Structures are given as C-alpha cells and as structure tokens.
Curated annotation (Swiss-Prot):
InterPro entries: DXP_reductoisomerase, DXP_reductoisomerase_C, DXP_reductoisomerase_N, DXPR_C, DXPR_C_sf, NAD(P)-bd_dom_sf
Binding residue positions for 1-deoxy-D-xylulose 5-phosphate: 117, 143-144, 164, 187, 200, 205-206, 209
GO molecular function: 1-deoxy-D-xylulose-5-phosphate reductoisomerase activity; manganese ion binding; NADPH binding
Function: Catalyzes the NADPH-dependent rearrangement and reduction of 1-deoxy-D-xylulose-5-phosphate (DXP) to 2-C-methyl-D-erythritol 4-phosphate (MEP).
Protein name: 1-deoxy-D-xylulose 5-phosphate reductoisomerase
EC number annotated for this UniProt entry: 1.1.1.267
Amino acid sequence: MEERTLVILGATGSIGTQTLDVLKKVKGIRLIGISFHSNLELAFKIVKEFNVKNVAVTGDVEFEDSSINVWKGPHSIEEMLEALKPDITMVAVSGFSGLRAVLSSLEHSKRVCLANKESLVCGGFLVKKKLKEKRTELIPVDSEHSAIFQVIEPEVEKVVLTASGGALRDWEISKIDRARPEDVLRHPVWNMGARITVDSATMVNKAFEVLEAMELFELPFEKIEVKIHREGLVHGAVVLPDGNVKMVVSPPDMRIPISYALFYPRRVALEPFFLRTISLSFEDPDPEKYPAFFLLKEIKDSYALRTAFNAADEVAVEAFLKGRIRFGGIHRVIEKTLEEFQGYPQPRTLDDVERIHFEAIKKAERVTEWLSSTSY
C-alpha cells in the first residue's frame, strides 16, 4: 500500500500528541509537516523523532533549524499547506483560529480530519461551501461525531450525543457557583486541555457538538438529543424508524477516533476491547446545573450568535482559570454578551465572522471586568 502524507496542525496539543501515538503504532502514513503555537521544546522533539522537514509557527517563538522549512506568522499554516499539499491534514488547532486552518486544509488536502469545533460552530456555512467546491473528504475526530459517522443511516428518528456531565456533575447546585479551577479540571472520564475540560463542566462543549452535528450530518436541531452517560463507553447512537438503536461502544481513548479518521475506511489494530458485565446509564441534563448548554435554542439558527457564544465562552473560561471570576460567572458572561448580538445580521464571509468574533471578545471582556469588580 502506498504511503500517504500527513500534516498535523496543532501537533503539540492533546489531539496532536495522540495522533503521533497512533503513527508510532501503525504504518502507512508519513508525517511531512506540523504546526505549533508556543511549545518549542515539544516541537523540536517531534521534528527530531519523526524527521519532519516542514514547520509552521503561529506563536511568538523562535524556531531555527537550517535543515527545515519554517513558516512564521499568522498565515504560516496556509502557506505551508499550499506548499506541501498533503494527502491528509489533521486539524487539531484549538480555538477560533481553527476556522482559517480548516478552510485552508480543505483547499489543499485530499482528506481533512477535523478536531476543531469552532470552525463548524462559527463558520459552518463557509466550511460546507468549501467542501462543495473542492470535494475534499471531511472525517470528524470528536469521539461523538466519529461514532455518529460510523452508524448513521439515510433515515433516522434521533441522533444521540453522550456527555460525561463534567467534574461537577454530582455537586449540589447551590455549591457549583463557587467551584474552583482545581475542582473543575478533575474530569471524571477524559484527559483533555484546560478550556475543553471547563467547557465539559458547563456543557458548553456539548452545545458546540450539537451545532457541529447539525452541520456535519445535515440534521435539524430537533433530531439531536444529548444524554449524560457516566460510564464514558457509549460515544454516540442513532435511533432508527423501526425501533432499533445503533451505538458505538469503546473505551474513552481518543486514539480510536483519531485512527479511524486517518485510515478510513480501513480499521487498524489498536488495543482490543472486550465486552464485560457493565451497566449503561443515560440521563437528561439539568437546566439548573448546565444553564449555558440550554442557550442552544437561542443561538442555533444564527451564525452571529454562535460566534458570539464561542467568543464569550473563550473569554469567560480564561478569566475563571485565572481566578478573576467564579465558575458561575462563565454563564453570566456568555448570556450578557449574547444580549448585545440579538438581531445581528448573518455573516456572509470569513471577514464577517472574524469581525463578529473580535467584537464579541471585546464585549465579553467588558462583562468579565464588571463581574470581577463586583461580589455578584
């Protein structure tokens, strides 16, 4: 089998490093390029271990090596992808900047493995337009969307996305508001980055995933359900018209959906999972415990509101992790920011989306400043 070429965007992050783990175990893909933001030490280690000859640096750090092609600056990812035109691009860049990375990956790759949420949440219309133009393969990497991708059929009654409920799922509602960062970062199932772990506790992460599912699978909002599933074994399910339910069950290991996206339609051997005596539970999310998640109905049909929602969450989570606001303040920042964007016209271009994002960042920062100066 001919070796395919791969670029990993965000190679030093959680999904990036787990993608590298897969490459160590399974042959058939050659890593030809990476991007990273600021983890210089790990980037050098990856370059040396995988003999990478192309690097895009998006942060303000100096990467110097005369034997390597290095691109720097805000357009470094686009420039590297245009030069390399890889068979596969793993988009593991986190945050809003992932939207440009995804669009460029779709332009210059044959397959895009998507592990960035914001690109579909904020710019789903742009991603789908580019997909139609280029006919690139888009394979989801999120465990929930990977599961649905594997079992979806032309006609479904419901699609079910599972959620852990986050680190505070068993806390009394009266105490959640004052949870500390160290409490929130103790995720019961997954080992992830800080922002996504906080987003799991607020279930903002699951709100993003509902919006992603709407875009990826062309589903109406009403056909998507979210259930809290404590065991972390069922990643997604589809309810079929004849009463059958198809679900994907596997250990909570991101290397499984990563390998599926990289090697699809071939399944590669990782560690086998054998069924044992297990209990599976499914619960509805509590609106009092997860108020930010239930803003979904308000934002689902507006890319402007979706973009503002994401930007406000980004600001609020950072403020919480730095101790500037309480955990309960995250929802307040999002809600107050969204009020400023009610009736905002739908974006039509990437520039429109970026303008809304930066406007929302500024508004969310003002709300955060106000909250941090009060005892609310």
